[in-house]
Amino acid sequence: MELRSCTYATVTTLGDFGPWISKVVLDLPCTVRANDIDANTFHIYVERHERSGEVLMRKERGADHAAPSVGYIDILAAYPCDENGRKLAVGTHVALEVAEQRLTKKIEGGVMGSRMLDDQLHITQLAALPGNDGDDLTCGLVFDTCRGDICPALKGWSNDTQKTAVDGIALEYGFFEPSFKAEDSACFNPFAPEATAVPQKAPLVVYLHGAGEGKGATQGEGATRAYIGNRVTALSQKQIQRYFGGFAWVLVPQSPTFWMDNGVEQLGRSNQSIYSPVLKALIDEFVAEHADRIDTDRIVVAGLSNGGFMTLRLCADYPDFFAAGLPCCAPWYNATDEDVVALAKTPLWFTHSKGDELVCPQQTVLPLFARLRGAGANVHLTYFSHVEDLTGVYREADGSAKKTFNHGVWIHQFNDLCYQDFDGGNVLIDGEPVGCWEWSARVSR
């Protein structure tokens, strides 16, 4: 039997634990119906490659040596679809749904550094398909050429580079641009479209990534990993956008090293950063480029871990600039009186977890929060007892909620689950409880 080479596309989902291939779309030379295919019609072999070309060698937990990151993955469902993977009754494309697992992950690394991978798939036909117009059955299809990737969550996202360098540094960044069309608003009501307000100017959320999403030694990636390595794209989705009236810009700069780099130590505890003036210049540049569309009284800065530190550094350095700051598991040690005075000028909502393995709360957020409260600051702290999945998506083998390391509390921030204040009560605005994102959307400079 002669084999026929065909093309495929991947569909990427951006999840709490990074981007992963959730679906493969096969481009068929024939038309199929739903009852012509099932999960056993094809099988999928995956090789995870470094961008340099070689197969990723990975040491799995409990293993005594590294092994090639390759293998077969199970198909959960198969059905006719269009070229983008949307389900149809009849079509010339087939969607193969697969599970989130190591072999479908698109980023490799950890909290101190990561990199994008090139996942290469080889899909083989195992059962005959109908022919076209009475032709013989279709057999021997091999899908070994990827025509591209589809990621719905990246709609509206772009990458760019800072135009004017500061101290020789020009940051790469990603950004989400709202469409300013009523039908695209997170608040759009199809039954009353005329009621959807489209503002002339929209708020801006600046989000600062953690240590693992900096540029480091990677080349040619652009800033994409800064907002997909952890699910910063949640800020462009309906759940959080609706708090900002359905339209909010998102700016995600990427650090060349670490935001905590003070010019001497890359991860020191001096609470200083060489990137503070660079970031402020980038924000000013970005705002100037979109001056007719950004509300400068509603610029919110937020960040996780290393980026949580940088959130506080920017608020301390530019105390009259930001409407609010949302630092998550922020490593700010030994705050001075001057730090407290400066930080107290910006409304802040901290998120942290008890038992954080990397940023001890007793040395960072707890004393800083207490001093800010004592100074009369507008400050809140959501303090989780531990970190586990609260969405019902991720489960342990016994069916209980999946537990992760306690430093990873940002998954709760991105899932809009930060509501409770440190004293166990709700944060209220106009008598109604709000979470950190709604709170930040309702304050202004």
Name what the model sees in each region.
Residues G245-A248, A342-L348:
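Short, proline-enriched alpha-helix->beta-strand connector loops that line the catalytic pocket
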Residues M1-V25, A39-T41, V46-A202:
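A domain-start/cap signature at the N-terminus of enzymes
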Residues I107-G110, K215-T224, D261-Q266, R313-L314, ...:
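Short, solvent-exposed loop/turn and secondary-structure capping segments
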Residues A211, S255, L326-Y333, G355:
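Active-site nucleophile loop of the alpha/beta-hydrolase fold
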Residues W349-T351, G355-L358, Q363-F369, R373-R445:
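C-terminal catalytic histidine-bearing segment of alpha/beta-hydrolase fold enzymes
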Residues A202-L204, A211-P277:
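Active-site machinery of serine-nucleophile hydrolases
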